[in-house]
Amino acid sequence: MTDAGDTPPRPRETMRGQPRVLQPFLTWVTGVPLAGSAPRVRWRPGLAAAAGVAQTAIGIAVGALGLKAGGVLAVLLVLLAWPVIAGGMRRLDVVVVHQTLHRMFVASDAGNRVMSEILTTLLWRPPYDGNKEEHLLHHAYPCSLRDGDTNYLSGTGARPGMTRGEFRRYLVKAVFSPRHHWSFFSARVKANFFSRPPAYRLAMALVYLAATVAFLAFSGMWLPWLLLWFVPATFFFHNQTFLYTLSEHRWWLFDNAERLTKAQRDQLTFARFCGAPVPARSGGTTGGARRALAVAAWWARMVLVYAPYRLCVLVGDTVQHDLHHVRPKCDWANSSWERNDELTGDRAERFYEVWGGLLTHVYVGNSVLETSARPSVPLTPVAA
């Protein structure tokens, strides 16, 4: 079985010698703080929501600048903006809306409902009641055939036991499948208008639709809206949701059984840590130069491969999704440190992890041959 980051020291601890000013960036990208460290900023739910709004707005602004500039620059900036905008939308959906379903975004039931209904209306996502019912069913019967996410992935052609080559071909086919995108989009339309939502929620959806059409008709901004809202809210949102969901759990580990022991349920979810160990020092007269090049290449991967994955797909606290299933009432906005603390307590044996990137995580989530997760262990500080 293969297992990223299987040899000590832990991958995050190999980064201890990197510049101190860059450690918060490395904590964000990897999802793991250094052993013994404390957060420099204590996150709150409102700050998590603001981050989603800011990311979406910045992406739209970058795309708008591109459209204004025209030419090749327009193409480059719009291509850059698309996954960033969708990532901001995903942050609002899979982080903020998700926590409202668990009544963990604000203290009151009414407040959670209001926040959820506003965001799901704007993002064309399912209304609060149906969304909550389906999500709690996911928690009750994870990875079973009663779990809507399992059925969604099955519908895209996912299955266990594929080779890496077979799985990559499946990924490409699903990402560009018109059937996949139409199924996803039509389900969103149905949930908002035709699934008998509460009268107030149907009114919200209709007013939003009418306001959008009226604004576009009077402003003539159809092209910017199509490029900077509709495309990222559909094609990119669908695919970033799809890629996230593929690694959310080990979907086929126990053959979609409904009745599982606590230990089996724990094995279904793993922390999706991003990155690789810093290249080790080597001896010899040329060892320093070789390591400098290796570290530069390592930094390039962290910035150009793993950071976009965190920004656009594995957003917010979703890195530590195993913590959410072990302890849903945790301080989710600071889950990196919460999970580290759990590894020193009496629930430590309930946590699993995989180090790597998108492909590594989706391989493990779908039982691709020769891949697996490993149990987590408490972090131990090592010398830089």
Which residue ranges define each predicted feature?
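Transmembrane alpha-helical segments that form the membrane-embedded catalytic/substrate-channel core
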Residues: 84-97, 129, 180-183, 229-259, ...
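Juxtamembrane helix-capping/reentrant segments at transmembrane boundaries
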Residues: 105-123, 150-159, 260-301
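Generic alpha-helical structural context detector
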Residues: 120, 244-248, 319
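Functional transmembrane helices that form membrane-embedded active or gating regions
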Residues: 296-320
